[in-house]
Amino acid sequence: MEVMAIAKFERFFRLAASLDVDKSDLKRYGDFVNDKIYDLLLRAQAAAKANGRDVIEPHDLPITKGLQERIHEFRRIDEQIELQPILDQLAARPPLDLAYSEETEARFPEIAGGISVALAHSFKVIDPDLKNPQTKHWECVLRIFDLLL
């Protein structure tokens, strides 16, 4: 990841939840975002197939009320730091049995942003005084997300 991109992610986590992250956190973060997008896309694919379609549309994505609110929060933060182009490159488009519509692909960066805001807030839920997430914090938060998404 470029130095400028690293600085934007660091700023994002400070704005979203007053967290200080480092390079090792950013590797875990990238893996996390891609894993969760893949999980959402698997459910979207099942919805599209169940409805007899061969393309995944935005309404197939299982976006909960909470995630939608985090996407809105991401948009407000993104106005300050312009992270969306970096998330567009970061958010993997894993090959599935069905294709994605252009509208679905266009939503990937904002979904990644919403997941990112939820991640940042989750650290504060497990430890309100946390400033610098450690491995144990990452493991706890990842287990929680695996239970829910």
Could you describe each region identified by the protein language model?
Residues 1-149:
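Terminal helix-to-tail segments of small alpha-helical proteins
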